[in-house]
C-alpha cells in the first residue's frame, strides 16, 4: 500500500492501532481475532463492533461519512477480513471515486441528511436488523440530522455516533446539544449506550451504543466489567468521563 495515495496517514502517536502482537492485551476476544494483523478505525470502532458481535461473519453495515476507504475507516476490516457487506455514503465526489477504486463494497456520493434510506434498504434487500451503523460527518449537527432520517422500522445492532463533544468543550458551550439530542433519540428507541465520550488524544468525540434486544447481554456485561476492572471507566457515567478508544479494546 502506498501511504501517499490517501494522504491521511496520521502520526503514530495520534493513531494507536491494534496489531497481532497485542493479542495478549485484548480485554475481550472473539472468533477470528487471531487472524487480524491490524485494525483500521481511528479509535478501534471496528474492533468494538466485532467484540459486540463475537466475531460475526457476513454481517451488514451502513456507513455515514466514509471519508477514506481504509485509513481511519470503520468498515474496511469488517469487509476485508470478516466478509461483511454494506454501503457507505460520502459527500465528496473525489473521495467517493477513490473509495470505489479500492473497496469491494461501494460508496454513494450523496448528502446524508437528505438521502432516501428507505429506498436504499428496499433496493438492496437489507434486513430489518442491520448489524452496524457508523455515523460520522461534519459538523456533528449534520450527523444528528442523518440519524433522524433513519427509518423507524429498521434497527441497528451496534451504533457509533460522533458527537465531537471536544469542540463544544473548547467553545465553553456547556452540554453538547448534539449529544443530548442523540441520547434522546436513541434511548427512545430502546438502544443502550455502552461507552460514553470515546476520546482520541484526550478529545472526547463519540458515543458507542448497542441494541440490547439482539446483542448478547453477557458480552456487554463482560465488556463493561473489563473496562471497570482496569479503571478505565466508572458507572454511573460522570459528566466529565472520557476514555481513549484503544483502552476499550486493549489494556
Name what the model sees in each region.
Residues 98, 117-120, 168-174:
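Short, charged, surface-exposed secondary-structure boundary motifs
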Residues 50-51, 122, 146-151:
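Short amphipathic alpha-helices and their capping/turn segments at secondary-structure boundaries
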Residues 54, 91, 126-127, 154:
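Helix N-cap/coil-helix junction residues
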Residues 98-101, 120, 206-213:
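Short secondary-structure transition/capping segments
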Residues 1-44, 224-251:
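Juxtamembrane luminal stem/stalk of type II transmembrane Golgi/ER carbohydrate-processing enzymes
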Residues 107-137, 141-142:
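Internal catalytic-core helix/loop-beta-alpha segment
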Residues 76-77, 82-85, 128-135, 139-250:
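Conserved acidic-Pro-Pro-aromatic motif
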Residues 33-118:
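SAM cofactor-binding core of SAM-dependent methyltransferases
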